[in-house]
Amino acid sequence: MPRLHNGPALVIGFMFLFAQGASAQAQQSMKHGGSMQVPQSASPKDTPAKTALPIAVSPPVCPAGQPFDPVVNMCMAHGTMPMPVLTFSLNQFAVYSTTSGPRGQSRVTGPGVGMLMYNQPLSPKNTLRVKIMGTAEQLTVGDKGTPQLFQTENIDNMHPHDYLMALEFRDVIKLGAGDDQELTFLLAPRGAAATGPVPFMHRASAEGNPDAPLGHNLQDGFHDVSTVLGIAYRNSGTTVEATGFSGHAISWPFPLHKVDSYSVRVTQKIDDHVLIGASYADVLSPDDAGGAEHEKFVTGWLATTHTLDRATLKSSFIWGQVRVGHDPALNSFLAEAVYQRGMNKLYGRGEILQITPSQLDLVPPDGSTDAKWVKALTLGYERTLVEKGPFSLFFGGSFTRDFAPVEFRPDYGSAPRGAKLYFRIKVGSSSAMRDGM
């Protein structure tokens, strides 16, 4: 039940409304009579008794989109206050993975991520957004990781993420009369830096694919970093972002570190079907000798979404580059897409990237330390088994053919490959809450 804290103010407001009504009646009388007529004195019996009528005060005519609020007796310049919204989502796999060759492995793992988002309006033009993202991969994947040849951070396996991947607080301020302009301030003990496209685990063009891209460290590897401060400005389809963050390795739970790295990102929505973007990051990363070195990341991407008859096609094309100190730059190229028609999905991914022998803990026969080009092609299929409200259950499988350079074949074989079978659970729900939480 709403509480009234300003009793005197309401009384004064009522008196003000009463005075306005009386003034309006006087002006109406002057319009009809030319001037106010002072009545002659009359005896009580000559003047019939009249009952006082309530004064009706019509609300003012407000501009479009600005409703009248009778409580405060004024037009609400920015519309009514929206309700708080709580959103939960989960994307969880149970995967059997097998890879071939001298480094081949087979294992069951459970990669996945869950996210909780809360939007609390502070005013009609100001919203606080809180995002918490976490995973159980430390338990469901473990230190060994998910088998995948040519992954470099956890060699030949996709590493598990930390329990807490994001704890972000955003203050979003609408500018101007409409919704075209926004200014956002970001504070995150753990969160995403403004680098690269949407991370692979959230990317629409990677829906259903349990594999991480081999080049994800060059393309979107800073989706969970420490001590992030940021600002973003959006004007219609154009968004410009800047973040400062720590290049220090993240650890549990989420200790804060010195902000020693920065990034900038620009995205442009061409229309409802095409989006392009580019980013640059200078990261001070710890090295093996106990010091730190600057790593410079440049990324560009194109994302598309199209409806074809009763099907959808979503695709991404990504280029990422990193240069460590004065070393030669390493490049990665990715093209991926998912085609969905009814309960069926077909997805694919092709990658070409440069990998050094040291990244894979290799010693080539010729002793070369130069980066070599590695290629990978993945094709997969996913079927929706259950779809009920916010809950969906899928079953799928994928096959990957890797193409190793000659120098890497003693350790990987002449035709390295991998396969996966999996179940996937997806949950997404949203609720608006009256009167807050």
Residue ranges and their predicted role:
Residues 92-100, 134-140, 187-193, 235-237, ...:
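Transmembrane beta-strands of outer-membrane beta-barrel pores
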Residues 95-101, 141-267:
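Surface-exposed coil loops of outer-membrane beta-barrel proteins
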Residues 84, 106-114, 161-167, 223-227, ...:
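Residues that define the transmembrane beta-barrel architecture of outer-membrane proteins
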Residues 88-92, 128-132, 183-187, 231, ...:
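Membrane-embedded beta-strand positions of outer-membrane beta-barrel proteins
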Residues 139-146, 156-165, 280-298, 311-334, ...:
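Outer-membrane beta-barrel translocator/channel fold
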Residues 24-99, 104-105, 117-125, 131-133, ...:
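N-terminal periplasmic/intermembrane-space "pro-region" immediately following the signal or transit peptide
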Residues 379, 413-437:
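Outer-membrane beta-barrel "beta-signal"
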Residues 124-129, 177-183, 237-241, 272-278, ...:
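Repeated loop/turn-to-beta-strand initiation elements of outer-membrane beta-barrel proteins
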